[in-house]
């Protein structure tokens, strides 16, 4: 009798195992078949997310994705129902104002307060458009006459810190090296918190990572980016049971939870009965009908999304300038001449910076060489499917954007697209230059899915690059290896050590 029971149990186990194997095999074939004609970098990518997860977690995401289309063509399969492209026309079509392509579930990883949606995590075009309309006036500056004033205040703090602690001169010839990787994040964090909540968190003033937030987020980026690119991990991390036990809470002392508490505190003050109206982003949100909870989650998203990405663009621009003497001298000459001829204020205004052609070329080339965001940003093919490059793409397929490859396209940027050369923008007549700049701006999205923080990011870039190089000369400690670089949906640079020397004849006031 016991042997019969054991045999029956063994048979049941084998039957269960066989059923699982059969189910997985059928699922894999069904996933593989619709996109079978689209090349993939690995057989694993045709039926699983193992290749994509490995690529993302490796820290070499940018370099791997940059070379995909050279090997496999304009459409590459990176998952069972996922393809990636660097074709700007496809990217524009699926993101255009009238497109019916909704966002993929990948965007849900942007729930930095994981219990509520923000504008970024709204997947359907309709709700997303409504949310964007309510926040557009704040992000564009239309509702914020003092937008530039807020950036100027943090810029002056940055310049003051560099001058007092790091800048060498005849009186203080041996000052410590500046970690540009760290201080760039302090600057962008103080800018975004000043704009979002009406007061900065004081990262620059204290020269410390308040709440341990920046350090924790840097440690989390490999896991956050990998979970974004791997559906089953993403679903698990955002599941109610997981969040109930291990999700961030406002009572936490560090990280996302601590920042949630800070957002609740600042927003709560603005919804108090005796609160005064202010002309900042939060004030604009309130005037356009966002409730207290919505303001909290939007503010938190702004902080996370707008800090490291913009800081990375600042670092990329400066490090490329510092490692190219020709560009360094041209830019310094343009800056000095603009100051001497009285063409710029102190600090420079954005409208003045836009009139400096080589500064603009340097900024756009810096973004092109190392884009601030590297995420997949998938859009889902609607019912009926569509055809690209002679291949039918069925409904439900996620079309992802390959910014890494797009910004190195020889068709868009010339045969020397691999080379850092800002002069490529200077060589074009006005309309062609504008077209090339707009191609670079695809790094910030397009159409209805354009990054709402683009205006603020360009303001920070223009003002910080000009004013830092107006006030100082910068020299990398190690030009051969300027810093340590990893990419996880974003560039993370560290140990970017710089010797700072006060410039002569271009005093910053």
Swiss-Prot record:
Phenotype reported upon loss of the gene: Impairs the production of abscisic acid (ABA).
BP-aspect Gene Ontology terms: abscisic acid biosynthetic process
UniProt GO MF annotations: heme binding; iron ion binding; monooxygenase activity; oxidoreductase activity, acting on paired donors, with incorporation or reduction of molecular oxygen
Cofactor: heme
EC number(s) per entry: 1.-.-.-
Record: glycosylation sites: 402, 462
Keyword Signal tagged: yes
Family annotation (CDD domains): CYP57A1-like
Chain positions recorded as heme binding sites: 451
UniProt KW Ribonucleoprotein keyword: no
Pathway annotation from the record: Hormone biosynthesis
Entry's induction text: Expression is persistently induced 90 minutes after the addition of the ABA precursor mevalonic acid (MVA) to the medium.
Keywords noted in UniProt: Glycoprotein, Heme, Iron, Metal-binding, Monooxygenase, Oxidoreductase, Signal, Virulence
Top-level taxon in the UniProt lineage: Eukaryota
Cleavable signal peptide: 1-31
UniProt xrefs under InterPro entries: Cyt_P450, Cyt_P450_E_grp-I, Cyt_P450_sf, Cytochrome_P450_monoxygenase
Function recorded in the entry: Cytochrome P450 monooxygenase; part of the gene cluster that mediates the biosynthesis of abscisic acid (ABA), a phytohormone that acts antagonistically toward salicylic acid (SA), jasmonic acid (JA) and ethylene (ETH) signaling, to impede plant defense responses. The first step of the pathway catalyzes the reaction from farnesyl diphosphate to alpha-ionylideneethane performed by the alpha-ionylideneethane synthase aba3 via a three-step reaction mechanism involving 2 neutral intermediates, beta-farnesene and allofarnesene.
PANTHER family named among the record's database cross-references: CYTOCHROME P450 (PTHR24305), CYTOCHROME P450 MONOOXYGENASE (PTHR24305:SF77)
Annotated family: Belongs to the cytochrome P450 family.
Protein name (database record): Cytochrome P450 monooxygenase aba1
Organism: Botryotinia fuckeliana (strain B05.10) (Noble rot fungus)
């Amino acid at each position: 009798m016991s042997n019969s029971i054991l045999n029956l149990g063994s048979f049941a186990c084998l039957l269960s195992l066989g059923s699982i194997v059969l189910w997985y095999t059928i699922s894999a074939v069904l996933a593989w078949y619709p996109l079978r004609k689209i090349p993939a970098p690995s057989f694993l990518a045709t039926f699983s997310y193992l290749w994509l997860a490995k690529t993302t977690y490796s820290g070499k995401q940018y370099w791997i994705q940059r070379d995909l289309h050279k090997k496999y063509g304009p459409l590459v399969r990176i998952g069972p129902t996922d393809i990636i492209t660097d074709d700007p026309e496809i990217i524009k079509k699926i993101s255009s104002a009238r497109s019916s392509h909704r966002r993929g579930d990948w965007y849900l990883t942007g729930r930095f307060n994981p219990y509520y949606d923000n504008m970024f995590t709204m997947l359907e075009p309709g709700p997303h458009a409504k949310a964007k309309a309510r926040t557009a006036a704040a992000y564009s500056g239309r509702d914020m006459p003092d937008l530039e004033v807020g950036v100027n205040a943090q810029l002056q703090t940055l310049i003051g810190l560099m001058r007092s602690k790091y800048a060498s001169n005849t009186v203080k010839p041996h000052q410590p090296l500046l970690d540009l990787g760290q201080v760039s994040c302090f600057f962008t964090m103080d800018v975004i918190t000043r704009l979002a909540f009406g007061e900065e968190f004081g990262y620059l003033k204290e020269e410390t990572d308040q709440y341990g937030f920046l350090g924790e987020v840097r440690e989390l980026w490999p896991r956050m980016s990998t979970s974004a690119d791997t559906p089953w991990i993403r679903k698990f991390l955002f599941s109610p049971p997981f969040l109930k036990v291990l999700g961030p809470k406002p009572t936490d002392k560090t990280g996302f939870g601590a920042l949630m508490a800070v957002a609740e505190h600042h927003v709560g003050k603005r919804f108090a009965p005796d609160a005064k109206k202010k002309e900042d982003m939060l004030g604009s949100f309130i005037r356009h009908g966002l409730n207290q909870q919505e303001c909290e989650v939007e503010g938190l998203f702004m902080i996370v999304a707008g800090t490291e990405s913009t800081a990375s663009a600042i670092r990329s621009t400066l490090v490329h300038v510092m490692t190219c003497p020709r560009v360094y001298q041209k830019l310094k000459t343009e800056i000095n001449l603009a100051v001497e001829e009285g063409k710029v204020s102190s600090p420079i205004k954005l409208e003045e910076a836009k009139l400096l052609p080589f500064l603009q070329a340097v900024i756009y080339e810096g973004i092109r060489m190392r884009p601030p965001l590297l995420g997949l940003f998938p859009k889902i093919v609607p019912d009926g499917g569509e055809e690209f490059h002679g291949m039918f793409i069925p409904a439900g397929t996620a079309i992802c954007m390959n910014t890494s490859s797009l910004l190195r396209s020889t068709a868009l940027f010339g045969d020397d697209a691999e080379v850092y050369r800002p002069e490529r923008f200077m060589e074009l007549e006005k309309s062609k230059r504008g077209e090339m700049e707009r191609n670079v701006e695809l790094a910030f999205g397009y159409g209805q899915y354009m990054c709402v923080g683009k205006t603020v990011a360009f303001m920070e870039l223009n003002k910080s690059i000009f004013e830092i190089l107006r006030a100082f000369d910068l020299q990398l400690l190690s030009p051969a290896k300027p810093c340590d670089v990893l990419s996880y949906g974003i560039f993370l640079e560290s140990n970017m050590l710089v010797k700072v020397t006060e410039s002569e004849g271009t005093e910053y006031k």
